[in-house]
C-alpha cells in the first residue's frame, strides 16, 4: 500500500497550482482515495519521498509543507521510475 500512497502524493502535488500542499491536506486527500494512514505514517511517507529527491519538505510549526521536485514530477507522469513508488497508470 505504501507504493500506492507514494504515487498518489506525487500526483496530488503535481496537480495543484503551486505544486505544494500541507500535511493536513495530503492526509485528507489520501483518505478520499481510500489510502488513509496515521499522521506518523504520513510523516514517514513524506520523509521517504524527500530522501529520494521526489519532494522537499518545509517544517511549519508542528506540520510541514511538501513541494514536488522536477524528479518527482517525472515520476508522477511516468517519465521516470523509482523502486518503492507505484508506476502510474496510463489513464488519469
Residue ranges and their predicted role:
Residues 70-92:
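Short, amphipathic alpha-helical interaction segments positioned at domain boundaries
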Residues 1-20, 36:
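Short alpha-helical segments that sit at the start of domains
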Residues 19-30:
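Short acidic, hydrophobic short linear motifs in intrinsically disordered regions
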Residues 50-60:
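A short, conserved structural fragment
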Residues 62-68:
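Minor-groove-contacting beta-hairpin "wing" of winged helix-turn-helix DNA-binding domains
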Residues 36-51:
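Short amphipathic alpha-helical interaction segments
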Amino acid at each position: 500500500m505504501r507504493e500506492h500512497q507514494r504515487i498518489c502524493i506525487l500526483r496530488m502535488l503535481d496537480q495543484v497550482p503551486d505544486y505544494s500542499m500541507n500535511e493536513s491536506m495530503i492526509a485528507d486527500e489520501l483518505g478520499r482515495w481510500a489510502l488513509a494512514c496515521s499522521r506518523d505514517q504520513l510523516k514517514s511517507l513524506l520523509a521517504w519521498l524527500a530522501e529520494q529527491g521526489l519532494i522537499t519538505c518545509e517544517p511549519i510549526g508542528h506540520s510541514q509543507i511538501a513541494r514536488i521536485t522536477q524528479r518527482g514530477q517525472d515520476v508522477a507522469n511516468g517519465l521516470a521510475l523509482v523502486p518503492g513508488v507505484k508506476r502510474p497508470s496510463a489513464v488519469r
